[in-house]
Amino acid sequence: MPVPVPRAYPRLSHAIGFDDAPFAREWRGDVRIFGAVYAGPTLHAVVSGRVRRDGRNATDELSRLVTAQAEHLQLVFLQGIALAGFNVVDLGALHARTGLPVLVVARRKPRLDRIRRALLEEVPGGARKWRLIEQAGEMEPCAGLYVQRAGLLLAEAEAALGTFCLTGRIPEPLRTAHLIAGGVTRGSSAGQRV
């Protein structure tokens, strides 16, 4: 009797990555966010929107931007679970609204004790935001990075990183969104760490 062959993970070849623009520490208004749409190694589109500094609208705005580009998208990348300070993304809701898996990527494991303290002591609505971070689960090591995920297996996350990490450890859609955000906001992205 033949040995069953495990299901091959589908190759996730079309993705969008989001990053927020730099902002001054004292800034309290909206912060621009940028998304870079990739098909394999090729940049196909750039989108932008706005989220409130330390606000509650990141999930809604990301859902809107992803849905507008969703025809061929297969994956959403985020560099961290929050945009514009502590505007925390509800990963489960973003996955449910867009129908796409969501992969949060970080170079280092976050210091959750410090994040929890800051949220609960200094940020309006911090308890709700902390619950969203807890619901997302622990960050897991994956391909030399740390990830949180909604809607995909760890092996699929590793395969996606293999597909999109072209010029370093950070996936190209995130790297590009980061460079665009810095370039548009500061006039140049030279010298930025990605």
Swiss-Prot record:
Coiled coil: none annotated. InterPro entries: Endo_dU. Pfam families: DUF99. Gene3D superfamilies: archaeoglobus fulgidus dsm 4304 superfamily. PANTHER family: UPF0215 PROTEIN MJ1150. Belongs to the UPF0215 family. This is UPF0215 protein DR_A0167.
